[in-house]
Amino acid sequence: FISYALLYFAFELIHEDDLTKLNTRMYIYFMINGILLLFAYPLLFLLEKIFGFTSDVTLVELSNINNSLLREMSEVAPGTFQHSLQMANLAAAAANKIGGKSQLVRTGALYHDIGKMVNPAFFTENQSGVNPHKSLSYEQSAQVIISHITDGLKLAEKHNLPKVIKDFISTHHGRGLTKYFYISYKNEHPDEEVDQEKFRYPGPNPFTKEQAVLMM
């Protein structure tokens, strides 16, 4: 308000050279404009809730690695955290190349593996010599790996992450198989018809180009 008022006063003084000719109504308009700007930021979040969209402002805030959930991941699953940072940079660069929304895919990449925080030691990037999968069957190991999708969605719900971020969590493996455990099981049971659903991620497959970039 003050900036608008001072600029208007200066320009009018230059052009009119007469203070009595100043249009005082303009100051009222400047004041109204200042009030609207003051409420614009909180209104943005209200509109997001009502209409179900996520603004770039929200995505930028979520991508701050000092927020509580990402900070927790860096402590509980440091290998996964580093992997997510690398994926965020790579996926954002790839999205830029194909005309995708780089900020969206960057933020989605930061959160896509948050479910690994529930059982961090079962994922290679967090292991330090001991592999807990050795005490499990191939089917059990596959279910632990697959569960990082459902666990991630539960954490996303708990922390009120927007739907567009949840979609990255659910789609980043699509309907693919946990191939290592599936192939290992098949090799040990060559005469058995294997139920692929025991080794399959719940999906769905990616349905936006940003999700497809992250999956690749």
Where are the language model's segments positioned?
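Generic detector of multi-pass transmembrane helix bundles and their immediately adjacent loops
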Residues: 1-81
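Divalent metal-dependent catalytic cores for phosphoryl transfer on phosphate-bearing substrates
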Residues: 70-216
